[in-house]
């Protein structure tokens, strides 16, 4: 029998959310490398932040500078990377934040495992569905070139599969339309499910 028990705090998620005037959620941006996940998530965070919302963006590269710096890119390490991020995101949502996470997260099992940690409605899957051909053309880090040469193993979309979501809450192809309209679609969705109050966005415009 474990001696570790959960300590119930006197201040809960609902109280923190009320103080911030928002409903905490996790927006999980998934898609191929170069699909535009970080760009889209960053633009949304900027719009929400400027309107006075309390946010935090977890980025796939950034967490490997600290939280996950001990991990490589084997299947086991990539799974552990996402497990840690999911737990951190859960703590941040409990703190009352609107959390944005931008990770390739190639398998449905990984994403569904993270979704299962949250109450219904608090995990919003955003499939950034930009086609592989466009992602390769962009190749901002030169990774596709290396993967095609065989210099990178288990590279998602080339030598390792990407499992597209079957029922994502939102699907956005960043090769269609402009960034502003894509951010608008995300904000409209968050407004519709009452995560944010649209009057605050209007006031900040």
UniProtKB/Swiss-Prot annotation:
Job of this protein: Catalyzes the synthesis of activated sulfate.
Family affiliation: Belongs to the APS kinase family.
Protein name: Adenylyl-sulfate kinase
Keyword annotations: ATP-binding, Kinase, Nucleotide-binding, Phosphoprotein, Transferase
BP-aspect Gene Ontology terms: hydrogen sulfide biosynthetic process; sulfate assimilation
Source superkingdom: Bacteria
Stored Pfam families: APS_kinase (PF01583)
Enzyme class label: transferase
Known EC number: 2.7.1.25
Binding site for ATP: 31-38
UniProt xrefs under CDD domains: APSK (cd02027)
Transmembrane spans: none
Molecular function as annotated in GO: adenylylsulfate kinase activity; ATP binding
Pathway noted in the entry: Sulfur metabolism; hydrogen sulfide biosynthesis; sulfite from sulfate: step 2/3
Catalytic center residues: 105
Catalytic reaction(s) noted: adenosine 5'-phosphosulfate + ATP = 3'-phosphoadenylyl sulfate + ADP + H(+)
């Amino acid at each position: 029998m474990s001696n570790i028990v959960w300590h119930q705090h006197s201040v809960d998620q609902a109280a923190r959310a009320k103080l911030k005037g928002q409903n905490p959620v996790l927006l999980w941006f998934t898609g191929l490398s170069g699909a535009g996940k970080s760009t889209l998530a960053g633009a949304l965070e900027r719009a929400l932040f400027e309107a006075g919302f309390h946010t935090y963006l977890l980025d796939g590269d950034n967490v490997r500078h600290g939280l996950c710096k001990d991990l490589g890119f084997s299947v086991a390490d990539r799974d552990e990377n996402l497990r840690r991020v999911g737990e951190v995101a859960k703590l941040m949502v409990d703190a009352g934040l609107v959390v944005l996470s931008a990770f390739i997260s190639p398998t449905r099992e990984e994403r569904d495992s993270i979704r299962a940690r949250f109450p219904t409605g608090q995990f919003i899957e955003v499939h950034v569905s930009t086609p592989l051909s466009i992602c390769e053309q962009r190749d901002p880090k030169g990774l596709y070139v290396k993967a095609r040469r065989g210099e990178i193993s288990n590279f998602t979309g080339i030598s390792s599969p990407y499992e597209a979501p079957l029922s994502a809450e939102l699907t956005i192809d960043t090769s269609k339309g402009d960034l502003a309209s894509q951010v608008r679609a995300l904000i409209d969705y968050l407004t519709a499910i009452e995560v944010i109050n649209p009057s605050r966005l209007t006031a900040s415009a």
